[in-house]
Regions:
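Extracytoplasmic/secreted envelope proteins and their assembly/folding machinery
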Residues: 77, 122-124, 138, 169, ...
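Soluble periplasmic/extracytoplasmic beta-strand elements of cell-envelope proteins
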Residues: 60, 77-79, 122, 169-171, ...
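Acidic, low-complexity Ser/Thr/Gly/Pro-rich repeat segments typical of extracellular/periplasmic
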Residues: 2-250, 276, 414
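Gly/Pro-biased beta-strand-loop elements
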Residues: 234-343
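Short peripheral tails and domain-boundary helices/loops at the edges of structured domains
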Residues: 155, 251-259, 404-416
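Sec-exported extracytoplasmic/periplasmic mature domains
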Residues: 85, 120, 126, 173-177, ...
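Short, surface-exposed secondary-structure junctions/capping segments
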Residues: 36-37, 41, 286-299, 355, ...
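Exported/periplasmic cell-wall-interacting domains
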Residues: 303-416
Length: 416
């Protein structure tokens, strides 16, 4: 019970006791000074007894009871003064328990998991004061709704090891109009000391990169302090977290569509040269710097998904088990194994629909093929530089390919 509630209880007790004394007087007593003195003495004793029975422990629950736009991060908590917490329960409206952690000194409690959006929670707390008297407090609140909040889905994943070309890319689930406020709530730093700058691609995507590739064997830290930040009118952030990822060795591969060769370098030294087959004259491969964003040991490729269809509307090709596929653009450019083409094609003629093909065998299990070696020597974030294709340079937002912007143009896309 809070102090305010205790005071209300004492006032109620006073009124009740006063009423009893008044009825006794009306029923036939003397109205003298000694009677008034007796009433005052009885009231004082009643107040003293009530105070002794009330716990001094003062429990505070946040968010306050009735809140309907509560944060899902670090907002829910129970604290106590003049006592220690003995029991705290937190449940959703349907009774599902929420795990929590009581501090070692038993003065505070917090949920141990992030809360869900648009969910009503009930909190019940109990505490004892130094005399062993028990206090109780209850509260109910509802977290912010998805309609009134935004989150940023980021890559790479926490704890992952990626190549030197991997940007921090954040995709927001709501259009951001207050870009400066949101960008100020995000920091990206590297153990290498490299300057890192953000660049907006439209209203939903914000990428971060240094001027040159990340320093190999460094650690990058992403801090999101977006809880309560207004990204658009009536739409606030809910994320509050820090993640780190690691940069591996420096692998950059150079594909020359004219010579039809790919030179693979690690830490500046050429480790392998592989014959390739790039896009045909009718379906040229993009030029430019491209970052590996996904890897698939085997995947299906259907021409209809990228606009290559026959007159009947079906894909010009539909290969259900393309081996050793590595994505370079979101529009569908891959570097992958090819088991259906003659081995004489690689290194001599460009025949693909825009991808870069390497000699391979069906099943993706032949360790002796160039595609097997390249796939297993590569990690997400490695760089592939493609040249002499006769086509335009890939757009910087087609995949994770912001390296195709100059440093000046990259910085011009920052909101801060």
């Amino acid at each position: 019970m809070t102090n305010s509630k205790r005071r209300k209880g004492l006032v109620a007790a006073s009124a009740l006791l006063g009423g009893v004394l008044m009825l006794s007087a009306c029923s036939g007593g003397d109205d003298d000074a000694s009677g008034t003195k007796g009433k005052d003495t009885s009231q004082a004793k009643a107040d003293e007894a009530a105070a002794k029975k009330s716990s001094a422990a003062d429990i505070r629950i946040t968010p306050k009871d009735g809140s309907d736009n509560a944060s899902i991060n670090n907002s829910a908590a129970v604290t106590v003064s003049k006592g220690t917490l003995t029991n705290v329960t937190m449940t959703t409206a349907d009774g599902t328990a929420v795990a929590g952690q009581l501090s070692a000194d038993k003065l505070s409690w917090k949920p141990s998991t992030q809360l869900e959006r648009s969910t009503t929670y009930k909190v019940s707390a109990e505490a004892k004061d130094a005399s062993g008297l028990v206090a109780h407090e209850n509260a109910s609140f509802t977290t912010v709704s998805p309609a009134n909040s935004f989150i940023g889905n980021f890559t790479p994943e926490a704890g992952s090891t990626v190549g030197v070309g991997m940007p921090v890319s954040i995709n927001f689930d709501k259009a951001i109009t207050n870009k400066a406020a949101v960008q100020k709530g995000i920091t990206v730093s590297s153990s290498s000391g490299q300057q890192v700058v953000g660049h907006w691609f439209g209203a939903n995507r914000l990428d971060f990169r240094p001027e040159d590739y990340w320093k190999e064997n460094s650690t990058v830290t992403l801090k999101l302090a977006l809880d309560g930040v207004e990204g658009a009118p009536g739409v606030t952030g809910v994320q509050q977290k820090t993640v780190t990822f690691h940069i591996g060795r420096n692998q950059v591969s150079y594909v020359d569509a004219k010579t039809k060769q790919m030179k693979v370098t690690q830490d500046g030294k050429t480790v392998k040269t592989i014959p390739i087959s790039a896009g045909s004259p009718e379906h040229k491969t993009y030029n430019g710097v491209m970052v590996m964003s996904e890897k698939f040991k085997q995947t299906r490729m259907n021409g209809a998904t990228v606009g290559f269809t026959d007159d009947d509307g079906k894909g010009e090709y539909d290969i259900k088990d393309v081996p050793h596929a590595i994505r370079l653009t979101s529009s569908g450019t891959f570097i992958h194994g090819n088991y259906w083409g003659a081995k004489s094609v690689f290194g001599s003629v460009n025949t693909s629909h825009g991808c870069v093909g390497l000699s391979d065998t069906k099943g993706a299990n032949d360790k002796g093929t160039p595609a097997y070696w390249f796939y297993n020597s590569s990690i997400v974030g490695d760089v592939v530089v493609i040249s002499h294709t006769g086509d335009k340079t890939v757009q910087p937002d087609n995949g994770l390919n912001g390296w195709n912007l100059s440093w000046a143009d990259w910085k011009a896309g920052s909101a801060v």
